[in-house]
Regions:
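Assembly/oligomerization interface modules of large self-assembling protein complexes
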Residues: 1-15
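Short helix/loop capping segments that flank catalytic or ligand/cofactor-binding pockets
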Residues: 20, 29-30, 116-119, 163
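Sequence/fold signature of self-assembling virion shell proteins
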Residues: 10-12, 79, 119-189
Length: 189
């Protein structure tokens, strides 16, 4: 026999995010409303965006801070139908020449440029396919574009910024947002 008593709790995270857990019947939820599940959903729906933003920004910051590579490894060109494939292929060749490694690269491309690749796919000698499932470091990504042998993951532009601000989380404001004078990152390899 299961007996339930109810006490209301408010779960708050370190990002100024609060969840209100309403009274539920275990028969309806199957005991699924637990702190673990609420935290997992927060991580899946909100925290992953912040982690992506921070990681991409940190990689950009490291490349931009390297005087030997910041002019060759960071591309500021806007991707269009006419230059998208050549820009990504050129950056891949630069990185391969520099690292002397031929495999293991992944391109992160702003989702707003996906149309440029779709439009350019027909008129090129490159092998471009969309909708692939690719395993990268043990994580399977769906809807990946393959440009020859390079997996290209389309990422929301909001996660690809040159400047970020980590908010305090003291009030309702929390998380990571684009910083003042932030520019868009079109692609990262």
């Amino acid at each position: 026999t299961v007996t339930n008593s109810w006490k209301s709790y408010t779960l708050s995270m370190d990002r100024g995010v609060k969840f209100s857990l309403d009274r539920t019947d275990p028969n309806d939820t199957g005991f699924l409303v637990t702190a673990e599940n609420v935290i997992r959903e927060f991580a899946r729906n909100a925290l992953v965006k912040e982690q992506d933003t921070y990681r991409i920004h940190r990689l950009y910051e490291l490349a931009n801070g390297d005087a030997a590579h910041n002019t060759t490894h960071i591309i500021s060109a806007a991707l269009t139908k006419t230059n998208a494939i050549a820009t990504v292929s050129g950056l891949l060749q630069t990185v391969r020449d520099d690292a002397e490694e031929m495999d293991g690269y992944v391109a992160l491309i702003s989702h707003k440029h996906k149309t440029a690749f779709l439009e350019a796919a027909n008129g090129t000698y490159h092998d471009i396919s969309f909708g692939n499932a690719v395993s990268i470091n043990g994580v399977t990504y769906e809807n990946v574009m393959m440009l020859d042998d390079l997996p290209c993951v389309f990422v929301p532009q909001s996660r690809m910024k040159t400047v970020i601000t980590v908010q305090s989380g003291d009030s309702d404001q929390g998380g990571i947002v684009a910083g003042e004078n932030a520019k868009d990152i079109a692609e990262y390899l």
